[in-house]
Amino acid sequence: MDTTIDDLATKQCKPCEGAMPPLSQEEITQLMRQLDGWNYLGKTIRKEFSFKNYYQTMAFVNAVAWISHREDHHPDITVGYNKCQVEYTTHAIGGLSENDFICAAKIDTLFQI
C-alpha cells in the first residue's frame, strides 16, 4: 500500500540517532510522489510558498515554527516579502529521513487551509 500525503501528515516524527542511515533513493522517490511541488536536491527537499503580502508570509512562517517545535524537527527557512522557502534535511544522519517528509506533508496540509 502506498503512503499518501494524508498518511504522512498524521504521523509523528521520531527521534533520529546518528547511527540511523539516511533514506535510500527508492524510499525517497516513493515519498516524493506524495508531496506536491517539493524539489529533491540530493540531501534536502525544498519548496517555495507564495503569498499575497508580508503579513500572510509571516503568519505561515510562524505556523511552520509551531509545527517544527511540536515535531522537534526544524527546517531552514528563507523569508521574503511575499514568499518563503522551506528546506528540510536531517542533519544528524547527513541526509533525508522520514521526518523530513512528515513535516513537509504537515506544511502542505497547512498551506491548503
UniProtKB/Swiss-Prot annotation:
Keywords: Lyase. One of its GO terms (biological process) is tetrahydrobiopterin biosynthetic process. It is an enzyme of class 4 (lyase). GO terms for molecular function: 4-alpha-hydroxytetrahydrobiopterin dehydratase activity. CDD domains: PCD_DCoH_subfamily_a. It holds the Pfam family Pterin_4a. Its EC number is 4.2.1.96. SUPFAM superfamilies: PCD-like. InterPro entries: PCD_sf, Pterin_deHydtase. It catalyses: (4aS,6R)-4a-hydroxy-L-erythro-5,6,7,8-tetrahydrobiopterin = (6R)-L-erythro-6,7-dihydrobiopterin + H2O. The keyword Oxidoreductase does not apply. The keyword Lyase applies. Disulfide bonds: none annotated. Belongs to the pterin-4-alpha-carbinolamine dehydratase family. NCBIfam families: PRK00823.1-2, PRK00823.1-4. This is Putative pterin-4-alpha-carbinolamine dehydratase.
